[in-house]
């Protein structure tokens, strides 16, 4: 925005310090071969409407999430090729993983109604390569599968369960007279430590960090959790497939995000968020040994999310990324600043 450029705000500083050319729409868009829209979903319609008036013929429009196309139903000029590169993590983690020489798992897709030259997939591959995702894994998906699986993953295992489990596990430990500071650190950093094993060996490796008796206990607990939550997960999936979930979310956008901000405030006011800081280091294995319930929750949530998505017709690539592969990167945000950070960056 011109106003941001004139004021040289933080986004301007970030861009210029990283050697990006900064200018307004009218100066940059008409000459661009590829225009990437990374604005929040609620801003997409206005942004894309403006972009289409300025984009040159036969150019490419890129999304990192297909909500605007699938749920809002945005119509794009037929000469514009529409592609998607959807890193399976918050945007902050895309940058951090790239800086350390790696990347994040990514889904790529082409909007079939906007691929007039049949070159969309090659451009999407090149874009995903440029952010380092080829080092972590790039799978071809579709706009619909990415959106439906993304919404399902975030509402269940990725955000919903991590948030609810953090609050409930903390309250249980406090009720049992454990040190509040230790309990908070065990949970806050425990998700990150435990899910790191998912990156390298999935649920099997995570479970292998436990003793045999603890494995059996975690397995039994996870099976109980799955039975309790199966109908709830299926209801979430039904609401997402039908479009009801997205419809309610867009209504909240028009109401200045009242529900979202109220929920975010409720989370910020929980005892877990306000817990004292534990200064001492917790050994890595201790997170596993004292986190059997957390491991059971992760196992149940991953399996149930994946199974529910597959049973609803979502392709396995999208279901896998949204149930397991993105989980460690979401856990990273909790480790930094607990649940409020996760809610803000998602």
UniProtKB/Swiss-Prot annotation:
What's the record's note on cofactor binding? Binds 2 magnesium ions per subunit.
The processes (GO biological process) annotated in the record are:
isoleucine biosynthetic process; L-valine biosynthetic process
Q: Where is the KARI N-terminal Rossmann domain?
A: 1-141
- Reply yes or no: does the keyword Oxidoreductase apply: yes
- Gene Ontology terms, MF aspect: ketol-acid reductoisomerase activity; metal ion binding; NADP binding
Enumerate the catalysed reactions: (2R)-2,3-dihydroxy-3-methylbutanoate + NADP(+) = (2S)-2-acetolactate + NADPH + H(+); (2R,3R)-2,3-dihydroxy-3-methylpentanoate + NADP(+) = (S)-2-ethyl-2-hydroxy-3-oxobutanoate + NADPH + H(+)
Keywords (A to Z) from UniProt: Amino-acid biosynthesis, Branched-chain amino acid biosynthesis, Magnesium, Metal-binding, NADP, Oxidoreductase, Repeat
Record's GO cellular component terms: cytosol
Q: Write out the similarity annotation.
A: Belongs to the ketol-acid reductoisomerase family.
The name this protein carries in UniProt is Ketol-acid reductoisomerase (NADP(+))
Source organism of this protein record: Buchnera aphidicola subsp. Uroleucon ambrosiae
């Amino acid at each position: 925005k011109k106003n941001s450029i004139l004021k040289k705000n933080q986004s301007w500083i970030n861009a210029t310090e990283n050697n990006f050319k900064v200018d307004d729409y009218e100066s940059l868009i008409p000459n661009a071969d590829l225009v990437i829209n990374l604005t929040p979903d609620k801003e997409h319609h206005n942004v894309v409407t403006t972009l289409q008036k300025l984009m040159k013929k036969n150019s490419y429009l890129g999304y990192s999430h297909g909500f605007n196309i699938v749920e809002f139903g945005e119509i794009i000029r037929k000469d514009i090729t529409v592609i998607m590169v959807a890193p399976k993590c918050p945007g902050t983690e895309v940058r951090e993983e790239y800086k350390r020489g790696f990347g994040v798992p990514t889904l790529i897709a082409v909007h079939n109604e906007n691929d007039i030259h049949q070159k969309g997939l090659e451009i999407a591959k090149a874009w995903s390569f440029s952010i380092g995702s080829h080092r972590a894994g790039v799978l071809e998906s579709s706009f619909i599968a990415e959106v439906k699986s993304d919404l399902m993953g975030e509402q269940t295992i990725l955000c919903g369960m991590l948030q609810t489990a953090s609050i409930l596990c903390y309250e249980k430990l406090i009720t049992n007279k454990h040190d509040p500071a230790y309990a908070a650190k065990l949970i806050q950093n425990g998700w990150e430590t435990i899910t790191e094993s998912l990156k390298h060996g999935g649920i099997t490796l995570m479970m292998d960090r436990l003793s045999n008796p603890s494995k059996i206990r975690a397995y039994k607990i996870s099976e109980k959790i799955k039975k309790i939550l199966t109908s709830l997960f299926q209801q979430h999936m039904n609401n997402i497939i039908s479009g009801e979930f997205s419809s309610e979310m867009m209504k909240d956008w028009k109401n200045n995000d009242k529900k979202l901000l109220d929920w975010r405030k409720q989370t910020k006011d929980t005892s877990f968020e306000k817990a004292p800081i534990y200064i001492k280091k917790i050994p890595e294995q201790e997170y596993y040994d004292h986190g059997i319930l957390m491991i059971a929750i992760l196992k149940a949530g991953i399996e149930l999310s994946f199974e529910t998505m597959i049973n609803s017709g979502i392709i396995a690539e999208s279901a896998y990324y949204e149930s397991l592969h993105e989980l460690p990167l979401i856990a990273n945000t909790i480790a930094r600043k607990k649940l409020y950070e996760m809610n803000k960056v998602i």
